Amino acid sequence: MSRKNQAPKREVLPDPLYNSKIVTRLINRVMLDGKRGTAATIVYDAFSAIKEATGNDALEVFETAMDNIMPVLEVRARRVGGSNYQVPVEVRPERRTTLGLRWLVNASRARGEHTMKDRLAKEIMDAANNTGASVKKREDTHKMAEANRAFAHFRW
């Protein structure tokens, strides 16, 4: 591991349509092979499908979904006296958002709908209703942290 200073965090510019940084980060997560235009089209089409299906503002639905996906606790491996313990720790805000977006996009890609636009839209709507694979991932993470609560005193 490098002993030099940590690289500075780069600021993400808000997207032009919704003026939101989290939407830009979603576009970056959806992007494959550097094709940002294609990724932006997928995300914006998914948002218009959400607006059509729910009648609510797509950005509000997305933010509700993200609140339902982002984890509060996770477990981290800690070596104590020759054995590894899964120690529950709180998740930092930046990592919460990153994990939430990662789980959302991965769950969308695993879905069965025909186009990525449909998969993303359905997964966001499911997450906003507290269902779907991405919310299940969060629940599993919280369950794991709860199960290992006995090791919380090993926190560092």
Swiss-Prot record:
The gene is rpsG. Disulfide bonds: none annotated. One of the primary rRNA binding proteins, it binds directly to 16S rRNA where it nucleates assembly of the head domain of the 30S subunit. Is located at the subunit interface close to the decoding center, probably blocks exit of the E-site tRNA. PANTHER family: RIBOSOMAL PROTEIN S7. Pfam families: Ribosomal_S7. GO terms for cellular component: small ribosomal subunit. NCBIfam families: rpsG_bact. GO terms for biological process: translation. Keywords: Ribonucleoprotein, Ribosomal protein, RNA-binding, rRNA-binding, tRNA-binding. Part of the 30S ribosomal subunit. Contacts proteins S9 and S11. This is Small ribosomal subunit protein uS7. GO terms for molecular function: rRNA binding; structural constituent of ribosome; tRNA binding. It comes from the Bacteria. InterPro entries: Ribosomal_uS7, Ribosomal_uS7_bac/org-type, Ribosomal_uS7_CS, Ribosomal_uS7_dom, Ribosomal_uS7_dom_sf. Gene3D superfamilies: Ribosomal protein S7 domain. CDD domains: uS7_Bacteria (cd14869). PROSITE patterns: RIBOSOMAL_S7. Belongs to the universal ribosomal protein uS7 family.
